[in-house]
Amino acid sequence: MVSIRPCQIGDLMSMQNANLTCLPENYQMKYYLYHFLTWPQTSFVAEDDKGNVVGYVLAKIDENEPKRGHITSLAVLRSQRKLGIATKLMKQAEVALLEVYDADCVSLHVRKSNRAAFSLYHEVLKFKIDEIEKEYYGDKEDAYSMVLYLKPEVEEEKEREKQLEKINKAAKESIEAAKRANEEPKPVSNVIHGKKKNVKKIE
């Protein structure tokens, strides 16, 4: 039986070990400590019936956007996968970000090649692709930047903004295309006022 509970300072070493075992993106201990001290309510661990940490989610609030939560890292030991643990961890983090920090949304990054993780985020947790960030990872692999809106009204507003941005972009491109067409030099013609111009042949 696996239970989900808030992260405690004594869990940080186990979280780091799970990270090193499961993921290519690794962090020094001071990074986990920084998360725990700065956002103590947003990170959770999965614990088995023997008290062992078998998974974790490390979450925070974006320093530049105080209404935007972010999932820094999610890991579940291979022996404990396919049991819904990752989904439970993510749901707990989403609730904490909304209730504690009143976050509008939560974002994350996932490797384009990580189909299992993408399927979890997109199909199960309903995250949407926001953009593709080129060479995001240290090995130059691209990342999907994904977002889940925690408030329906905020999602609707963002969708309206995106549609307006698309309309404005299309209008701008149309205006620029018209300008280029007007600026193109017209072909020189030897017909003047409907009459063929006589061109003197030089012998």
From Swiss-Prot:
Class of the enzyme per the UniProt entry, highest EC level: transferase
Keyword ATP-binding found: no
Keyword tRNA-binding part of the UniProt annotation: no
Biased composition (Basic and acidic residues): 177-186
InterPro entries, alphabetized: Acyl_CoA_acyltransferase, Ard1-like, GNAT_dom
Stretches the record annotates as Disordered: 177-203
Entry's EC annotation: 2.3.1.-
Bias (Basic residues): 193-203
Tree of life domain: Eukaryota
GO molecular function, one term: protein-N-terminal-glutamate acetyltransferase activity
Keywords per UniProt: Acyltransferase, Transferase
Sequence ranges assigned to domain N-acetyltransferase in this UniProt record: 2-151
One Pfam family cited in the UniProt record for this chain: Acetyltransf_1
Gene Ontology cellular-component terms listed: NatA complex
SUPFAM superfamilies: Acyl-CoA N-acyltransferases (Nat)
Role played: Seems to be involved in N-acetylation.
Similarity comment: family membership: Belongs to the acetyltransferase family. ARD1 subfamily.
Protein name: N-terminal acetyltransferase complex ARD1 subunit homolog
Provenance organism: Dictyostelium discoideum (Social amoeba)
Gene: natA
